[in-house]
Amino acid sequence: MTKITNDLFLKAARKEQVDRIPVWYMRQAGRSQPEYRKLKEKYSLFEITHQPEICAYVTKLPVDQYGVDAAILYKDIMTPLPGMGVDVEIKSGIGPVIHNPIRSFQDVEKLTIFKPEIEVPYVLDTIKLLADDMLDVPLIGFAGAPFTLASYMIEGGPSKNYHQTKSFMYREPEVWAILMEKLGRMTANYLIAQINAGASAVQLFDSWVGALSRADYAEYIRPVIEMIVREVKAVHPTTPIIMQAVGASHLLEEWETMPLDVVGVDWRETITSARKKVPTKAIQGNLDPSTLLAPEKCLKEANRILQEGVLEPGYIFNLGHGVFPEVPPEMLKQLTNYIHERSEILLKKDDIK
């Protein structure tokens, strides 16, 4: 296995002292990069993600180009679902489309047991290739969290309000619990397999869980998240687990009482206020990705965020959501350099101004 020579990200995830703030970006690999767009002229998304050498190349690009302190596996949160019998298609301009949406107990009952080594060997081969031969920074594996996956499976695709998902959850609580159990087992097994293959950390993407109230989260979602984290930690107790959601600041206190290591926040929550709600966790975030299209504003906001981030150990600079396709790669390189240089200065100062 290639030795990790830059462990800033892992130190921050463990709330240890660092000499500069680590930085990486959600969706840092892929559609905003000219090299990726050139690949897409020759290969489909399916081909890119199913060929370990190509997928590893795409995953590593931001490390080489931007100098980020962690790589995140280039995959989709839908990747494991076909291994459970879900007929999913990623449509350009739309996103995931489910051709056999869940409508009943019978549909949930049909979901099969997911075995990562059998269903997604190409994912594990990509991780092994990166960890063994290509990276000197930590590799982050990831999975979609059960609520977000269920919302696609029930709605049949992207949704703005999740009415069908919520009504199913409210009307059929017993069936919902079975669905969560199945998705939870799949997610835990998937994350464990990624760590076994060489991932240094894992992130749970619960993109749409902010649509739920805290009371509903506690009743319908918290048990399965606790189960996932518990099962992963039982096998890999020292591997950092990150929880990432959008518009979910009202759920921070729920995550504080789980054995998570890092909590991601978006631009709706300041780093300072987030720390008060999750004092035992490292914080990741929280630049609005829209500012990447306004360079002067971007660096100004980054400086403001850093002023708060450096006040305590356990801070990782990131966005509150993913990189847009329109973002120039040069902007991400400039921002990465700025975060490294500015945070190093701030961390050396006794008085932060």
Curated annotation (Swiss-Prot):
InterPro entries: UROD/MetE-like_sf (IPR038071), Uroporphyrinogen_deCO2ase_HemE (IPR006361), Uroporphyrinogen_deCOase (IPR000257). Catalyzes the decarboxylation of four acetate groups of uroporphyrinogen-III to yield coproporphyrinogen-III. GO terms for cellular component: cytosol. GO terms for molecular function: uroporphyrinogen decarboxylase activity. The lineage of its organism: Bacteria, Bacillati, Bacillota, Bacilli, Bacillales. Keywords: Cytoplasm, Decarboxylase, Lyase, Porphyrin biosynthesis. Its EC number is 4.1.1.37. One of its GO terms (biological process) is heme biosynthetic process. Homodimer. It is found in: Cytoplasm. Pfam families: URO-D. It comes from the Bacteria. Its main location: cytoplasm. Substrate binds at residues 27-31, 46, 76, 152, 207, 321. Belongs to the uroporphyrinogen decarboxylase family. SUPFAM superfamilies: UROD/MetE-like. NCBIfam families: hemE (TIGR01464). It catalyses: uroporphyrinogen III + 4 H(+) = coproporphyrinogen III + 4 CO2. Pathway: Porphyrin-containing compound metabolism; protoporphyrin-IX biosynthesis; coproporphyrinogen-III from 5-aminolevulinate: step 4/4. It is an enzyme of class 4 (lyase). This is Uroporphyrinogen decarboxylase. The record marks 76 as: Transition state stabilizer. The keyword Cytoplasm applies.
